[in-house]
């Protein structure tokens, strides 16, 4: 079984890259986010998940072990195979997935082509107790207790901030930072403070 490949990125397709290892080209399927980071002719180390079928051996490559772990984690959900797992990882980072699952945000998954309401619900339900076990992001781990810090409805605030131009990760970080300093803050004040401090230490 192949666990890692180190070589030069050769040609790319919509969902794969050819990795040249000492003159041998390996076809490796990857997420769109991974493919976007690869430059032809540059040297990369890819962590590989090998799937053996009766007639084929498929290689799936990842720049980080975390993405590889989430690739396998997503496939533990009933109805998600390798193609759908890569599609989700093409749209969401592991941190995005963890935040969405933790906040029971089904809509972020429903926005992905091929993910319907039922599958989005299964992702949230089936991964709820699993995502924290494999994520390596301390920032996201620290933010998982956000609902327990304050009675403020953090989901409503995050959605409002996203509508105002924040990324999901920015919204999570700024809400966490403000609530830590002022646990009794109101929703209105939290949003106002977030807007004032968008470029402050909460994003450093």
Swiss-Prot record:
Free-text domain note: Has three domains with a flexible linker between the domains II and III and assumes an 'L' shape. Domain III is highly mobile and contacts RuvB.
Keyword Cytoplasm: yes
UniProt GO MF annotations: ATP binding; four-way junction DNA binding; four-way junction helicase activity
GO biological process annotation, one example: DNA recombination
Xref: NCBIfam families: ruvA (TIGR00084)
Protein name per its UniProtKB record: Holliday junction branch migration complex subunit RuvA
Record's function text: The RuvA-RuvB-RuvC complex processes Holliday junction (HJ) DNA during genetic recombination and DNA repair, while the RuvA-RuvB complex plays an important role in the rescue of blocked DNA replication forks via replication fork reversal (RFR). RuvA specifically binds to HJ cruciform DNA, conferring on it an open structure. The RuvB hexamer acts as an ATP-dependent pump, pulling dsDNA into and through the RuvAB complex. HJ branch migration allows RuvC to scan DNA until it finds its consensus sequence, where it cleaves and resolves the cruciform DNA.
Family classification: Belongs to the RuvA family.
Residue segments, region Domain III: 153-204
Name of the gene encoding the protein in the UniProt record: ruvA
Region (Flexible linker): 143-153
Record organism: Rickettsia canadensis (strain McKiel)
